[in-house]
């Protein structure tokens, strides 16, 4: 997924368009800051990336290529890039102007993160062995 797609989803979540469909004036600042915010979120989601891709954390390259522009690909599984990252980005974008809404989007992010990871984690059913 391109970073711009995640950015557009985040803007839609925080409703940054007026009734005529034009962006509000602070969107230019949002766009300038979005690549670095996305890189920070990718770092937060890197452990989840291992889980989703079923890769041992010791085997993954932790030095991912950071995005530089919104036209770059987000180096995450599609489920994380499209279903989780936009909520965190929405939260970070509006943190200074509306901390209550930012907190709401951060809770949505943590819920989405848990849901995606849970969908990829499988456990075998069986008895628990008493080791005492």
Model-predicted segments: where are they?
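Conserved short "hinge" loops at termini or chain/domain junctions
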Residues: 1-67, 103, 115-132
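Residue-level detector of alpha-helix boundaries and kinks
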Residues: 26, 73-74, 94
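Structural motif
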Residues: 73-82
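Short, hydrophobic/amphipathic alpha-helical patches that form generic packing surfaces
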Residues: 82-94
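Short helix-capping/linker segments at secondary-structure and domain boundaries
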Residues: 92-102
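Amphipathic alpha-helical scaffolding segments
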Residues: 104-111
């Amino acid at each position: 997924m391109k970073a711009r797609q995640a950015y557009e989803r985040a803007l839609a979540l925080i409703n940054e368009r007026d009734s005529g469909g034009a962006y509000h004036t602070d969107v230019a600042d949002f766009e300038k800051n979005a690549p670095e915010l996305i890189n920070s979120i990718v770092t937060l989601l890197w452990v989840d990336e291992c889980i989703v891709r079923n890769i041992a954390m010791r085997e993954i390259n932790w030095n991912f290529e950071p995005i530089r522009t919104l036209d770059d690909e987000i180096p995450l599984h599609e489920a994380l890039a499209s279903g989780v990252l936009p909520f965190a980005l929405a939260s970070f974008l509006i943190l200074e102007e509306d901390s209550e809404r930012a907190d709401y989007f951060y809770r949505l992010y943590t819920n989405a993160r848990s849901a995606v990871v849970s969908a990829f984690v499988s456990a075998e059913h069986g008895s628990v062995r008493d080791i005492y």
